[in-house]
Amino acid sequence: MSIHIGAKKGEIAETILLPGDPLRAKFIAENFLENIECYNEVRGMYGFTGSYKGKRISVQGTGMGMPSISIYVNELISDYGVKNLIRVGTCGAMQEEIQLRDVILAMSASTDSNMNKLRFGGMDYAPTASFRLLKKAYDVAQEKGILTRVGNVLTVDTFYNEDVNSWKKWAEFGTLAVEMETAALYTLAAKFGVDALTLLTVSDSLITGGQTTSEERQNTFMGMVKIALELAE
């Protein structure tokens, strides 16, 4: 066991899906995996291991934000030997051509957080995805006919920003969408020499103010999860 994960050694697969919501982790396990076993309920942050098309895979809730996902990613890699970490979540679109329910593959992640500035002595670091996972996910999406967009996303520390226009400068530089975890995930993957990728479903648009319904989010989320599950090795 690690501090925040109750699993024993060997109970977590080398490839893991990381939704922020622990109930979404439970949904993925119960609806997509076979022979599932729950290895974690610590703090209500569910973790499951099962199989998908004969390949062993795990799914673990991470909570919201860079500090929370950093805890789970550190322990999954250091204590359980996870090699492929795939975040599946939602985001807000920053570009006019991006529609609700589109799927985004995060090639890289900018951030307004000071986490990496503290780590790198005030200098910037460019967190990037695993090219191997990125290419494979894109190819799978093409095969399944799922429209995907690939590019930079913005990882933010605050969900409710007092400056409602702060996103516009990022959009000017081509940033596709905003979310809250990817920069931390990619930085830690680089530190430990493992592979990581974020897949995001567009749940709302900062351009139009449009939002998806819970049913629409669920239906689109399932397509994204099907892409992510194909990355199991």
From Swiss-Prot:
Reactions mediated catalytically: a purine D-ribonucleoside + phosphate = a purine nucleobase + alpha-D-ribose 1-phosphate; a purine 2'-deoxy-D-ribonucleoside + phosphate = a purine nucleobase + 2-deoxy-alpha-D-ribose 1-phosphate
InterPro entries referenced in this protein's UniProt entry, alphabetically: DeoD-type (IPR004402), Nucleoside_phosphorylase_CS (IPR018016), Nucleoside_phosphorylase_d (IPR000845), Nucleoside_phosphorylase_sf (IPR035994)
CDD domains, alphabetized: PNP_EcPNPI-like
Annotated site residue numbers, Important for catalytic activity: 217
Superkingdom: Bacteria
Pfam families: PNP_UDP_1 (PF01048)
GO molecular function: purine-nucleoside phosphorylase activity
EC number: 2.4.2.1
Residues annotated for a purine D-ribonucleoside binding in this entry: 4, 162, 179-181, 203-204
GO CC, one annotated term: cytosol
Listed Gene3D superfamilies: Nucleoside phosphorylase domain
GO biological process: purine nucleoside catabolic process
Binding site for phosphate: 20, 24, 43, 87-90
PANTHER family: FI09636P-RELATED, URIDINE PHOSPHORYLASE
Protein function: Catalyzes the reversible phosphorolytic breakdown of the N-glycosidic bond in the beta-(deoxy)ribonucleoside molecules, with the formation of the corresponding free purine bases and pentose-1-phosphate.
HAMAP family: Pur_nucleosid_phosp
Name of the protein in its database record: Purine nucleoside phosphorylase DeoD-type
Native organism taxonomy: Bacteria, Bacillati, Bacillota, Clostridia, Peptostreptococcales
Gene: deoD
